[in-house]
Amino acid sequence: MIDFKMTKEGLILLIRDYQNLEEVLNEITSRVTQMGGFFAKGDRISLMIENHTKHSQDIPKIVSRLRELGLEVSQILVGSTIEGKENDVRVESRTTVESTGKVIKRNIRSGQTVVHSGDVIVFGNVNKGAEILAGGSVVVFGKAQGNIRAGLNEGEQAVVAALDLQTSLIQIAGFITHSKGEENVPSIAHVKGNRIVIEPFDRVDFERSE
């Protein structure tokens, strides 16, 4: 179900398609514990989920479990397999979470997925059926209609913002909402009181989020 692979990109945790998240989390704990002295606290690894679209909502819990075990996820990879075919692994980010954001100057069309370990900034629209998975925050200078998952590394401090926030789904860390912002009103989604709230840009209140 899971395997650690050493590639030219470094150590990758490969998670194959699965049915039960709890089994995956337990196996991660077991494997890392068995490997004992191989890892040092704070070691960075890459994460690759074989069917990331199907399981993207599980990424925060997987990242959280790895952190509990002393490992940090430096990047998320998408691709079909890494066994003997390193070129099948497409690296969306070779930078750490603390890096500057990934800037996209185009519309993200239906069926397209953007994966980045830090912040994602889009100068364009995120169309319905598109998806963004970001380790940090997501800012869309346009209309956001697809699925946006933020805070996969940064956690609850991440935000999702757009000039028109009409998303099908917003996830920040382990919180999910299907709510939308006011139409044609620049809005920001952030975690407040253990839930995601969406507020107009000129009335957002971060001070009470903590």
Swiss-Prot record:
Taxonomy, superkingdom: Bacteria
Pfam families given in the database record: MinC_C (PF03775), MinC_N (PF05209)
Stored InterPro entries: CAP/MinC_C, MinC, MinC_C_sf, MinC_N, Septum_form_inhib_MinC_C
This protein's record includes keyword Amino-acid biosynthesis: no
Coiled coil (UniProt feature): none
GO terms under biological process: cell morphogenesis; division septum assembly; regulation of cell division; regulation of cell septum assembly
Disulfide bonds: none
Alphabetical UniProt keywords: Cell cycle, Cell division, Septation
Similarity annotation: Belongs to the MinC family.
Function (record text): Cell division inhibitor that blocks the formation of polar Z ring septums. Rapidly oscillates between the poles of the cell to destabilize FtsZ filaments that have formed before they mature into polar Z rings. Prevents FtsZ polymerization.
Quaternary organization: Interacts with MinD and FtsZ.
Name of the protein: Probable septum site-determining protein MinC
Organism: Thermotoga neapolitana (strain ATCC 49049 / DSM 4359 / NBRC 107923 / NS-E)
Gene: minC
